[in-house]
């Protein structure tokens, strides 16, 4: 057990330590959502921790006491990929990634308080996850998902025959999606049953593919779909799943449906909200999500957008009666927030939903029959909600969340009452020592069209009488936000503790401040958002005396990377000592190489060939803009980023080099739009922070700050001089 002490949070901090470093950030324990047992006594959650010395990330599962917040170890077996409660909560079902079937997984059942007392119920012949269970007579029906072959079988990569050629042949889109070339396999929801034999359950290995009979359907939908894309009714008889509209071009439209199908697959799944269908509200043809059955299984709630090619449209709650032809009802449809998840109370009368509101992921409640103009009520909690589960049959929920100052917040929330803290990681993990809400504050500034929100993040040991260089961080999306939440990639506190004050703006295009602000970036990427950023920068310069804008830096990823490239060619670009652009577009016309065409065709008001002027308007490579470039810039782009090609980053670096501007190109051949592998993440931080520290002067003022020379990777430089030295 000694080797797994990290599984249980430390009771006290070490007596001394450095500020929050990239090593602390990457190696801090990472905890998953806490799922309570049916009695409301314990919750189980996954935890892992990266070890830089051993270059591995062992993991395990813990139990959280819901009365006092105490944590105990359930298992240290890293092969246990997921756990769910069985029956009254005295037992658990878990999936083990090692199995006698090569490439398959085992389904095991164990006592919740004696994990070693486990038995194997059966094997699944392929990768399988996302278990959901429901009692059905003397059986336990379940659903989960895996990859399907074209014939409908569960795909087993280990058993697959090696192709005679590496060729890929396409007659339609997608060719690539996010980080993967699309193949013949696709995601599908499968159903099965655990049969009781005496006091044990067994699984015969038989699964029914519920998705494959619907041609061109796929669920969960990649790249981010998971178990939230489907649900199993409480009686175990009916399954709901979300799929993009099978009859429509998936790369061009976001339309998706909620399908209903018997658990045994005896009928082909049918959509309840088909576009222009008899039950579907008029004009509603956008993306659907989060299907969930009412406790009695007679109704199903889900979320849906209206617009068919807009991934950031406002979601509205919908409720449909199961087995009925009655029209689908829209709930609180005038609420100017976009719900992200929905659940029913145990009596089926109240809906609990999460939604982003003013840069915080909040929990709300509303009646299940709420009228259009109803405004949901906020449930008090700290930080942002990642997930929530009801505690027994009560109105209280167990919230798993995080914030800008802690990567795990477990708390109990009850409508109309103060929240009750169970476990906050920053109060226990040595790596997070000193982090807290005291160093975070909001900033509101008059922007181009309305007031714009930003977060100010201060370093450990902040002194208002001192001056700190500005780190101006621009979020991606563009329909996204800097929220009061923890990022495992771009974490403002890591930047601040190099010796900066971070300002993280939420300009035009950001989510959580009303749909108009989100929509207003359409065909205006370099317009209002840029003006917002200028006004925020000017406000900081003129009114916040502890921030040094003369030695500030700007950095961003994705849309934030585009904005940094845009800023390089604008007056604001001359105000920074250094720039960092991660996976940002450079040449306007290159956007046609992206994967999800609906994204660019919405944001630029037309197709690449019919509205070319809109794509060209915000082209960072225009000669008149490039002529203004002079600020040192770090460019980052990865080979498996299929949102926008690595050629974008290479082209940007080429121009910087030919212009003789101090610049560096950082590339990870095994990373995507994001950098997620621990050792790569450390190098990323060493390069990014080392770059800005060099040009901002932090290396001189803070001897402990990261330097470019701290990175062990050899720099490739085959040229002794710049092109313009000759």
Curated annotation (Swiss-Prot):
- List keywords of the entry alphabetically: Allergen, Glycoprotein, Hydrolase, Protease, Secreted, Serine protease, Signal
Presence of keyword Signal: yes
Q: What class of enzyme is it?
A: hydrolase
Q: Which GO terms describe its biological process?
A: proteolysis
SUPFAM superfamilies, A to Z: alpha/beta-Hydrolases, Tricorn protease domain 2
**GO molecular function per UniProt:** serine-type endopeptidase activity
Q: What is one term from the GO cellular component aspect held by the record?
A: extracellular region
Segments for region (Disordered) = 269-291
The glycosylation sites annotated in the UniProt record are 96, 252, 605, 638, 699
What EC number(s) does this enzyme carry?
3.4.14.-
Quote the catalytic residue positions: 558, 641, 673
InterPro entries in alphabetical order:
6-blade_b-propeller_TolB-like, AB_hydrolase_fold, PD40, Peptidase_S9_cat
What the entry lists under Gene3D superfamilies is as follows: alpha/beta hydrolase, TolB, C-terminal domain
Pfam family, any one: PD40
Q: Which residues form the signal peptide?
A: 1-19
Q: Where in the cell is it found?
A: Secreted
Q: Which family is annotated?
A: Belongs to the peptidase S9C family.
Protein name, per record: Dipeptidyl-peptidase 5
Q: Which organism is it from?
A: Trichophyton schoenleinii
What gene name is listed for this protein?
A: DPPV
């Amino acid at each position: 057990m000694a080797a797994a002490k990290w599984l249980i949070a430390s009771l006290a901090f070490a007596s001394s330590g450095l500020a929050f470093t990239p090593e602390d950030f990457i190696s801090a324990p990472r905890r998953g959502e806490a799922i309570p047992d049916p009695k409301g006594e314990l919750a189980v959650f996954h935890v892992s921790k990266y070890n830089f010395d051993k270059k591995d990330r062992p993991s395990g599962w813990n139990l959280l006491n819901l009365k006092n917040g105490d944590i105990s170890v359930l298992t240290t077996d890293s092969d246990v990929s997921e756990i769910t409660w069985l029956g009254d909560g005295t037992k658990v079902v878990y999936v083990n990634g090692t199995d006698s079937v090569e490439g398959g997984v085992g389904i095991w059942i164990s006592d919740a308080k004696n994990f070693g007392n486990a038995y194997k119920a059966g094997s699944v012949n392929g990768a399988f996850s996302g278990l959901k269970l429901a009692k059905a007579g003397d059986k336990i029906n379940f659903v989960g998902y895996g990859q399907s072959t074209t014939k409908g079988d569960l795909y087993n990569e280990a058993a697959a025959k090696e192709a005679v050629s590496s060729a890929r042949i396409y007659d339609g889109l997608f060719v690539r999606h996010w980080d993967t070339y699309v193949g013949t396999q696709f995601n599908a929801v499968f159903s099965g049953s655990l049969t009781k034999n005496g006091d044990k359950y067994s699984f015969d290995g038989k699964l029914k593919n519920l998705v494959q009979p619907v041609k061109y359907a796929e669920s969960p939908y990649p790249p981010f779909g998971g178990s939230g894309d489907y649900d199993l009714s409480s009686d175990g008889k009916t399954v709901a799943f979300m799929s993009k509209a099978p009859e429509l071009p998936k790369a061009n439209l976001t339309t998706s449906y909620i399908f209903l199908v018997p658990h045994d697959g005896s009928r082909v799944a049918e959509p309840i909200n088909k576009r222009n269908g008899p039950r579907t509200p008029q004009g509603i043809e956008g993306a659907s999500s989060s299907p969930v059955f009412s406790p009695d299984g007679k109704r199903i709630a889900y979320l849906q957008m209206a617009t068919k090619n807009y991934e950031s449209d406002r979601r509205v709650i919908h409720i449909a009666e199961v087995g009925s032809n009655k029209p689908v009802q829209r709930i609180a449809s005038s609420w100017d927030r976009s719900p992200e998840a929905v659940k029913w109370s145990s009596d089926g009368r109240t809906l609990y939903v999460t939604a982003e509101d003013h840069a915080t992921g909040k929990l709300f409640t509303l009646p299940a029959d709420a009228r259009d103009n109803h405004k949901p009520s906020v449930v008090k909690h700290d930080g942002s909600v990642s997930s929530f589960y009801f505690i027994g049959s009560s109105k209280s929920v167990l919230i798993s969340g995080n914030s800008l100052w802690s990567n795990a917040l477990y708390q109990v929330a009850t409508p109309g009452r103060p929240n009750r803290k169970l476990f906050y990681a920053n109060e226990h993990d040595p790596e997070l020592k000193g982090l807290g809400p005291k160093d975070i504050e909001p900033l509101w500034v008059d922007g181009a069209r309305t007031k714009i929100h930003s977060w100010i993040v201060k370093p450990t040991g902040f002194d208002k009488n001192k001056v700190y260089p500005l780190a101006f961080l621009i979020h991606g999306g563009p329909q996204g936000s800097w929220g009061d939440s923890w990022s495992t990639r771009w974490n403002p506190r890591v930047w601040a503790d190099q010796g900066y004050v971070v300002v993280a703006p939420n300009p035009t295009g950001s989510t959580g401040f009303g749909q108009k602000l989100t929509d207003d970036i359409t065909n205006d990427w370099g317009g209002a958002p840029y003006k917002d950023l200028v006004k925020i920068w000017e406000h900081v310069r003129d009114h916040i005396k502890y921030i040094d804008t003369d030695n500030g830096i700007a950095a961003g990823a994705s849309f934030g990377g585009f904005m940094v490239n845009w800023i390089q060619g604008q007056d604001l670009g001359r105000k920074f000592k250094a720039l960092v652009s991660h996976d940002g577009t450079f040449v306007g016309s290159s956007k046609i190489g992206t994967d999800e065409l609906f994204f660019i065709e919405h944001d630029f008001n037309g197709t690449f060939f019919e509205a070319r002027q809109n794509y060209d308007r915000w082209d960072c490579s225009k000669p008149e803009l490039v002529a203004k470039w002079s600020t040192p810039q770090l460019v980052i782009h990865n080979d498996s980023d299929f949102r926008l090609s690595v050629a974008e980053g290479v082209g940007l670096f080429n121009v910087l080099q030919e212009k003789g501007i101090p610049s560096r190109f950082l590339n990870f051949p095994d990373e995507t739009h994001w950098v997620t592998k621990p050792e790569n993440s450390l190098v990323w931080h060493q390069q990014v922070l080392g770059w800005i520290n060099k040009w901002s002067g932090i290396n001189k003022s803070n001897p402990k700050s990261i330097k470019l020379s701290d990175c062990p990777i050899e720099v490739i430089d085959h040229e002794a001089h710049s092109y313009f030295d000759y």
